[in-house]
Structure formats: C-alpha cells, structure tokens
Amino acid sequence: MKISRSLSTVEVHTGGEAFRIVTSGLPRLPGDTIVQRRAWLKENADEIRRALMFEPRGHADMYGGYLTEPVSPTADFGVIFLHNEGYSDHCGHGVIALSTAAVELGWVQRTVPETRVGIDAPCGFIEAFVQWDGEHAGPVRFVNVPSFIWRRDVSVDTPSFGTVTGDIAYGGAFYFYVDGAPFDLPVREAAVEKLIRFGAEVKAAANAKYPVVHPEIPEINHIYGTIIANAPRHPGSTQANCCVFADREVDRSPTGSGTGGRVAQLYQRGVLAAGDTLVNESIVGTVFKGRVLRETMVGDIPAVIPEVEGSAHICGFANWIVDERDPLTYGFLVR
C-alpha cells in the first residue's frame, strides 16, 4: 500500500448534524486571515475536502471543519468549514461541536462551571461558553456575529412552486427565510424530498435575482441556503425549521447561523422582544435556543448580536488514508 495522505478526525454531532473535525494531516495554510487560508485551500488542496466529505468516507450531507492556527489574540484556534459543495462562511452547529470537543478533550484550559472557547471563523471571531462540571461538557452557548435583515418581503419565481416570498437575513451566512405552511411543507423527515426541491429552487432563484454582499466582508456574497419554517412537533418549541443549503444538503440540526439570522429577523419585525427566547426545532426534533443580547450596526444596517445555545456529543475518532492506487481516490457522490 502506498499512502499518499493520512488524516485524523474527531467525529461529533450537534443535534443530529455531523461535524467532522480534522485535527491532523493538512498542509501548512498560508494567509493572515481565515478567509485567505480558505481561498488557498480551495485553489490548492480541495481534494482533501472531497476525500473527507464524499463517499465512501462521507456522504452527500456530510459537514466538517479544518482546525488551523488562530488569527486574533483572543481566539484559541481557527476553523475552516467545509461541506459537499465547498466551504462556508459560518456554521453554528460546527461552533457548538468544536467547543464541545475542545472542552471534552482538553484543547483549552477548562474552568467550572463554564469554559470559554474563542474561535476564528471566516465570518469573524466567535466566542462560545461550554458548561463544564469537571467531568462532562454540557450545553454550549455562543455569541453570534452581528445579524440583520438584508431585504424584507422579496419574491422569487420557482419552476415547481410558483412565486415564493420571504426575507433575506444574515446570521453569519445569508439565508432566504420562508414560511412553509402555504406550500404544504411540514418540517418532518417524511417531507424531506419536497423540502429539498423547494429549498434548492428558492436558493437558485434568489441568488440569480438578489446579488447579496456583506457590507463589511465582501467575500460573503451569496445566499447560502433556504430556511423553511413551520409548526413544531414539541409543545415547548416556538417553531420548527429546515435548512437546505450548499448542493441540496439538509441540516439535521436547527442550524446555528440560521437561528441567529432568524432571531434578528423576528426581533426586527417586532415578533421577538428583548428577553424572549426562540426555541427552534430541527427536522429531527432537536432544539437550539436563541435570543437577542443587544442591538448594533453593520455599516448603516441596523443589526443585533444574538446568542445561540445547543448541545453536541463526540461519537468517534478516525484515521483516514488516501491510496493513490484507489480508482476512487478522492471519492464520489450518489444522490
């Protein structure tokens, strides 16, 4: 056997959504910012992402992150998020997974009852706080990036569902937020094929019609996914939502950055008051909580700083190899 690459990972899930943390095996990443390092990876070593996200090592809905050195003085480490289509700007479920792993595995100095974890991401610095009893990590809350409504009541035309109206909001990534009830889209596992078709059509139409650009981070310049909300299954939940993102990927968690954007959307529309908590349910029934910490501005756009809370669990450790003689060296996808 001729091993051309060996990679080590920690396998975590957040509310059911996989997050594969790559801890070793990457080349040294040039660049003074996480965005620059991500750009270098995309141009020079994208086969690593494909090997870890695609079958047979991964699957069409796989998600993960590369650990890298921090770029800001208060961060413990940096992360580059990756998925089936490429690389993302933010990943709230990934922040929760990374923070849990960092505390459980001793990557940071642990304190009782809560341990702080600082993470540099493409969207900026994220500060998380992990409950720690001296033996086990518990729920994680993180202070999200400034979040805001970019456009209200915008419409797109789709091939299968006609005209769809919603808001475009930002919570670390841009999403098109829409009510699923008028389209008979329950947020349940049994409806996943219809949810995927709807979400993919809306995302494609929205990106074609609305050229979004973050006012302070010009590299964030596309609509990452569609978030479809409807009635929850649990009495204590405010809503359920399903995020269809990247290349028709379905988030099993309630979506961390999407929850941040939803908090901003509801607050700026007067639906969620200061001090209220959004209990956001996923397609599999797991829950994130979100609330507004304070108001702020992003350029000339009114925004809020949300806090998002959820839980993650380590479910494995793995060593992966790439054998250049393998005809499926860097993987494939079957949808």
UniProtKB/Swiss-Prot annotation:
Pfam families attached to this UniProt entry: Pro_racemase (PF05544)
Assigned EC number: 4.2.1.77
Chain positions recorded as substrate binding sites: G92, H93, D251, G256, S257
Lyase found in the keyword field: yes
Keyword RNA-binding belongs to the record: no
GO molecular function: trans-L-3-hydroxyproline dehydratase activity
Reaction equations catalysed: trans-3-hydroxy-L-proline = 1-pyrroline-2-carboxylate + H2O
The name this protein goes by in its record: Trans-3-hydroxy-L-proline dehydratase
Phylogenetic lineage: Bacteria, Pseudomonadati, Pseudomonadota, Betaproteobacteria, Burkholderiales
